[in-house]
């Protein structure tokens, strides 16, 4: 396992009012729970087994092994960059793609120990991974991150823009620094990473880009003007880039999670949990693995090759 450094947490959704209290649930704090993939199987029938979700890449890997033994040829596994991948949703995505046979660059901003653990888990499963510490809102860090992946594995096939932060506050009290920090990481970071990775994808006329947005980008939320604006921007950005890159066979989609199980939700009182769950038709929190299952489908499943410019909500029916 290799480690690179240069300088992530994906989003949050907040309930406007819960008995006079306001609650913000950071998605990136969502832990990868035991029984990996079990929840995804229940929620996404098309991904009801890991073999369906990853049949394309695993078939390639199996074929490569046979051909290599007989004729010295091989089929390369896809190279993936996941930003903000040290914990929560990003961690679940990195593990899912790593275990599916991809080579994964695990990006982090501060949580180096957690990122190393993600890489080790991928390697323990037989995959390849490296970590890179860098701030995706800084152009020089993004360029270094892309170079690290290319130097190690020769290319970038898939980009998952997951890194993000929240700096909540009512608009009248929000400081410009709170606004700018969220916009810089959650929106400008997506722009910088996409632009850098797309240069590589365009040359070979193939690639997949998945942006992690939020239901807040669709419906807004009091106290999160900065975050809502950034995620709405990610959604508009996704659709525009999908149009620009479609002729180069680059698929660009967004995933918009709702309330996702996290360390914070596990510590909530029964009354608060009850009020939150009343807003979710399915009556439960989502799991990081469910988001990862959807991302995996969009990233490597051949059945998603005709899907681009779409926003997939995964919120238990909260915004339908």
From Swiss-Prot:
Annotated positions binding NADP(+): 82-106
GO cellular component: chloroplast
Pfam families, A to Z: adh_short_C2 (PF13561)
Binding positions (substrate): 214
Transit peptide extent on chain: 1-61
Active-site annotation: 227
Gene3D superfamilies per record: NAD(P)-binding Rossmann-like Domain (3.40.50.720)
Keyword annotations of the record: Chloroplast, Fatty acid biosynthesis, Fatty acid metabolism, Lipid biosynthesis, Lipid metabolism, NADP, Oxidoreductase, Plastid, Transit peptide
Gene Ontology MF terms: 3-oxoacyl-[acyl-carrier-protein] reductase (NADPH) activity; NAD binding
Catalysed transformations (reactions): a (3R)-hydroxyacyl-[ACP] + NADP(+) = a 3-oxoacyl-[ACP] + NADPH + H(+)
Protein location: Plastid, Chloroplast; Plastid
Pathway where this protein functions: Lipid metabolism; fatty acid biosynthesis
EC number(s) from the headed UniProt entry: 1.1.1.100
Quaternary structure (record): Homotetramer.
Enzyme category, top tier: oxidoreductase
Membership in a protein family: Belongs to the short-chain dehydrogenases/reductases (SDR) family.
A biological process from GO: fatty acid biosynthetic process
Name this protein carries in UniProt: 3-oxoacyl-[acyl-carrier-protein] reductase, chloroplastic
PANTHER family xref list: 3-OXOACYL-(ACYL-CARRIER-PROTEIN) REDUCTASE, 3-OXOACYL-[ACYL-CARRIER-PROTEIN] REDUCTASE FABG
């Amino acid at each position: 396992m290799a480690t690179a450094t240069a300088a992530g947490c994906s989003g949050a959704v907040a309930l406007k009012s819960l008995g006079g209290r306001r609650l913000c649930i950071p998605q990136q704090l969502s832990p990868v729970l035991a029984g990996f993939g079990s929840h995804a199987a229940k929620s996404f029938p098309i991904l009801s087994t890991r073999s369906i979700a990853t049949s394309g890449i695993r078939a390639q890997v199996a074929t490569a092994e046979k051909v290599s033994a007989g004729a010295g040829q091989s089929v390369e596994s896809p190279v993936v960059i996941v930003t903000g991948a040290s914990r929560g949703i990003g961690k679940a995505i990195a593990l899912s793609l790593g275990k599916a046979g991809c080579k994964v660059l695990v990006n982090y901003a501060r949580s180096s120990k957690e990122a190393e653990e993600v890489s080790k888990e991928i390697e323990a499963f037989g995959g390849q991974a490296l970590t890179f510490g860098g701030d995706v809102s800084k152009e020089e860090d993004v360029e270094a991150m892309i170079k690290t992946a290319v130097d190690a594995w020769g290319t970038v096939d898939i980009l998952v823009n997951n890194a993000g932060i929240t700096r909540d506050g009512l608009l009248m009290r929000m400081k410009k620094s709170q606004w700018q920090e969220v916009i810089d990481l959650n929106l400008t970071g997506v722009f910088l990473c996409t632009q850098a990775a797309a240069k590589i994808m365009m040359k070979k006329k193939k690639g997949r880009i998945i942006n992690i947005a939020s239901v807040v980008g669709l419906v807004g939320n009091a106290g999160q003007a900065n975050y809502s604006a950034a995620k709405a921007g990610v959604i508009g950005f996704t659709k525009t880039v999908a149009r620009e890159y479609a002729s180069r066979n680059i698929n660009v989609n967004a995933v918009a999670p709702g309330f996702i199980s996290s360390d914070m939700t596990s510590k909530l009182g029964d009354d608060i949990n009850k009020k939150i769950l009343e807003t979710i038709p399915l009556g439960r929190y989502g799991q990081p693995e469910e988001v990862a299952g959807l991302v995996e489908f969009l990233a490597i499943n051949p059945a998603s090759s005709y899907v681009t410019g779409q926003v997939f909500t995964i919120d238990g029916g909260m915004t339908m």
